[in-house]
Amino acid sequence: EKWALVQIDRNLSTSIAMKGIEALHRNDVPFHCISVVTADAMEQPERMYRFFRDNGITNVGFNVEEQEGINTSSSMQGSAMEEKYRDFLRAFWRLSEQDGYPVVLREFEQVISLIQGNARMTQNELNRPFSILSVDWEGNFSTFDPELLSVASDRYGSFNLGNIKDLSLVESTHTEQFRRLMADMTSGVETCHKSCEYFGLCGGGNGSNKFWEHGTLASSETNACRFGTQIPTQVL
């Protein structure tokens, strides 16, 4: 009975999402799709590709299932899954190539644009302070990765820097909490720069992935960066 209810809920949410896509098409509103990819998808690249193509979804990003928050593990962990993901992306690329590239995959597009422009990244908005500002419903705010807003940890306490009602953004940069987060974030990015040949294509990774996988911002390679940057680059 519980499984039946879950299936009904999934079918309903899918139906609503497809109606939304139809409305966007009717009104010529451009959009992109972010798809969470799990182990179940690895055997179905053609099915996924045709879904996007046949529904006119031309800009797609793959978010590989991550170890994050209450998700203490991922179905995509391990070298065997990394190889399956390579095969999955190769198949997706071939299918799109055969049709004249009607579906643009974010992971490929990011790498291609950097290579074509002979450009490389030195950091990114998820490890650069206040490129992103996240505020919760009570006014508590944080920077760097939005996934860290209001998260509590043994190492850092709360990732929040203060409350927007009584602390300015400038004032928050003088707090011990900000200095500690900034020091560890900088250390992690520098380690990536020194040790990883893919650094110029990602700019030092994401703090939330480093924290959830290694317990500290002062770390480097993650499962997330292998799937998000390294493997797509290898496939190209």
Where are these regions (language model features)?
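Radical SAM/AdoMet-radical enzyme domain recognition
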Residues: 1-67, 74, 78
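Long, K/E/R/D-enriched contiguous segments that form extended
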Residues: 47-51, 55-121
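C-terminal accessory region of radical SAM enzymes
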Residues: 83-115, 147-194
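Short, small/polar residue-rich loop motifs at catalytic or cofactor-binding pockets
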Residues: 126-129
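Short, acidic, Ser/Thr-enriched surface-loop or helix-capping motifs
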Residues: 136
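Radical SAM enzyme core and accessory elements
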Residues: 149-152, 159-164, 186-236
